[in-house]
A protein has these predicted regions:
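Residue-level signature of outer-membrane beta-barrel architecture
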Residues: 35, 74, 88, 110-112, ...
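Short loop/turn motifs that connect adjacent beta-strands in outer-membrane beta-barrel proteins
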Residues: 39-41, 79, 113-119, 148-158, ...
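Outer-membrane beta-barrel "beta-signal"
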Residues: 108, 213-225
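Start-of-domain marker
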Residues: 20-76, 81
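Bacterial Sec-dependent N-terminal signal peptides
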Residues: 1-25, 225
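Transmembrane beta-strands of outer-membrane beta-barrel proteins
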Residues: 43-45, 82-84, 119-123, 138-140, ...
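Sequence/structural signature of outer-membrane beta-barrel proteins
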Residues: 48-56, 87-95, 126-132, 166-172, ...
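Residues that define the transmembrane beta-barrel architecture of outer-membrane proteins
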Residues: 25-27, 62-66, 100-104, 134-140, ...
Length: 225
């Protein structure tokens, strides 16, 4: 209970500290299904919903979008992998004036686990297509995962998550946009095939031109089939 009050207090302080600038708060639940085709090749399907609960000094709950995504991943060895993905974002049904988006993604990932902490670096290139424009986004993500009990994450145990991401978006219709994201959270291994994760992510959106502050509360269930 003390931890809950502390988290709520931090959220309120964050909201108050940036209230004079653009600030938005989101809740983002998702479910992720993954299965291995072979020892080196796997598929991943994700359904994700985004709800806005705070928008510039106003608390109001509205669904913003729904995402459907698929990734195919090929492991090159124990440390390196490549992947391609496709995603469709439904926004027109929820927000007036917004457009649905088709997104293609290419990914390279490098991960190591020298001791109890796993380190992961990920590069992504994305092509984001709407009815009015096409943009290209480039992403670098550094993430850590660490077991809370012992050298490995066993069934019934918790683990901590942290990540830092830098993004650049370019298009013919607007100036380059830079974004910074930082997140931290905790996960639990409920069984051999199910994990739950709760992550708080803070984003600085377009911080070189039109700075916006965004706070995401992300909850996810990962299921291995």
């Amino acid at each position: 209970m003390r931890n809950l009050f502390f988290i709520v207090f931090l959220l309120m302080v964050t909201i108050d500290s940036v209230a004079q600038e653009s600030f938005k708060g989101y809740f983002e639940p998702y479910i992720d299904l993954e299965y291995d085709v072979t020892d080196y090749y796997s598929h991943e399907f994700t359904v994700e919903e985004r709800t806005i609960w705070y928008n510039n000094n106003s608390f109001n709950v509205d669904v913003k979008q729904l995402d459907l995504a698929h990734f195919s991943t090929l492991a090159l060895d124990e440390k390196n992998s490549v992947a391609v993905g496709v995603q469709y974002r439904f926004e027109e049904n929820f927000v007036t004036g917004e457009e649905n988006e088709l997104r293609f993604t290419e990914e390279y990932k490098y991960s190591i686990q020298p001791k109890v902490t796993e380190f992961e670096q990920r590069l992504r290139a994305e092509q984001r297509i709407t009815s009015s424009s096409t943009s290209h986004r480039f992403r670098y993500n550094f993430a850590i995962t660490r077991a809370l009990n012992g050298p490995e994450i066993d069934t019934g145990e918790a683990y901590i998550i942290g990540d830092l991401e830098i993004l650049l978006t370019v298009s013919n219709t607007s100036k380059p946009e830079y974004e910074q994201r930082i997140g931290a959270g905790i996960g639990w291994v409920l069984s051999d095939s199910i994990k739950l994760e709760f992550v708080t992510e803070y984003r600085l959106d377009d911080f070189t031109q039109d700075l916006g502050h965004e706070l995401f509360l992300v909850t996810g269930m990962k299921v291995g089939l």
